[in-house]
Every structure is written in structure tokens, then in C-alpha cells.
């Protein structure tokens, strides 16, 4: 689960990631998160789906839930195609995509781009804040580990961001407070 703050309102948004089966879609349709993520064509993840599989899964998704494609060093053409054909509402770049990749992608689509950053030290957050992506995602690193990073490193952030990694019932309240103190 990921928590996101959006500078346009004071509400907390929820994103559930790693959907790959029809049962997952039925569960998120019932839970009604704001976003759901699909790890696309990243074979080293057991949660990975193909482009064709994500197209089929999204057909069953509640239209109020925005589908996010999670890409790790994917060819730009794959990202563009799934954004342009309406399969995805947002792209999350979770690999080594640099600023030139993000800027070029943004010239081809008006869909929103999320760039994930692994946070180990305060300077990692400063680097994230310089990103031209529409949203930044602050994570412990690697994705899907269930671990948090040191949230005390997060300053007041005046732009939309996702907080990811290890968010559960024991720390959800703290995650929400971090978002309220920022945006």
C-alpha cells in the first residue's frame, strides 16, 4: 500500500500495487483505493504482468480507480503505448530512468508521471524534489519489500508525493500525518 498526498486537496489517497490476477481486481474494486498499480513486463518480479494482461485486467477495474503502470527501465515505446491507448492513467518509473527520459516521455503524453526514489539519506529527498516528474514516490528501495525508510528525513514537501514501503495498520496514522505536514 502506498500513501499519496495531492497538493490540490488535503485528502490522503491510497494506491495498492502489484495486481496481477482477476481476484486482485475484484478485491480492489471492493476496497476502492484511489489508484492501483500493475508491474509491467519486469520478469524478475513474480507480480509482473504483460501489456496484454494489464489491458484485460483494466477492463474489469472500477472506473473510479486510476490504473498506474509500474515500469522498471522499460522501453519508452511500451510506456507510451499503454498511456496513449488509455490502458493506464499514470506511469510510475521505478528504475534508473533519468531526467532526459522523463522529459522526453512528457513530450509524448499528457498523462501524469511518477518517479520513484530510493531514500537512504536526506540528500536523496533533495534529489527527488528536483525531478520533473509530476509526482515523486519516496520508498525504502527496490519496491515490494514491506520495509520503511527513516521518515524523519522527510522535510515539509510542497509538491504532490507518494510515500511507499512498509505502510500497514501499525504506521498508517503516522504516514497520513507526514502528508498533512507537507503538502
Task: Walk through the language-model features, giving the residues of each.
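Conserved N-terminal beta1-alpha1 strand-loop-helix module at the mouth
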Residues: 1-182
Amino acid at each position: 500500500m502506498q500513501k499519496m498526498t495531492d497538493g490540490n486537496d488535503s485528502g490522503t489517497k491510497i494506491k495498492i500495487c502489484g495486481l496481477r490476477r482477476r481476484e486482485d481486481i475484484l478485491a480492489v474494486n471492493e476496497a476502492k483505493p484511489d489508484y492501483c498499480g500493475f508491474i509491467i513486463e519486469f520478469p524478475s518480479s513474480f507480480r509482473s504482468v504483460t501489456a496484454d494482461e494489464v489491458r484485460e485486467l483494466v477492463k474489469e477495474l472500477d472506473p473510479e480507480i486510476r490504473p498506474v503502470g509500474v515500469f522498471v527501465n522499460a522501453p519508452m515505446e511500451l510506456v507510451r503505448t499503454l498511456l496513449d491507448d488509455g490502458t493506464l492513467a499514470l506511469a510510475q518509473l521505478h528504475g534508473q530512468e533519468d531526467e532526459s527520459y522523463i522529459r522526453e516521455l512528457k513530450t509524448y503524453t499528457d498523462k501524469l508521471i511518477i518517479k520513484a526514489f530510493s531514500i537512504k539519506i536526506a540528500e536523496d529527498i533533495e534529489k527527488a524534489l528536483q525531478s520533473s516528474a509530476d509526482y515523486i514516490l519516496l520508498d525504502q528501495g527496490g519496491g515490494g519489500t514491506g520495509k520503511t525508510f527513516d521518515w524523519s528525513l522527510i522535510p515539509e514537501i510542497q509538491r504532490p508525493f507518494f510515500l511507499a514501503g512498509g505502510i500497514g495498520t501499525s504506521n498508517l496514522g503516522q504516514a497520513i500525518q507526514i502528508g498533512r505536514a507537507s503538502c
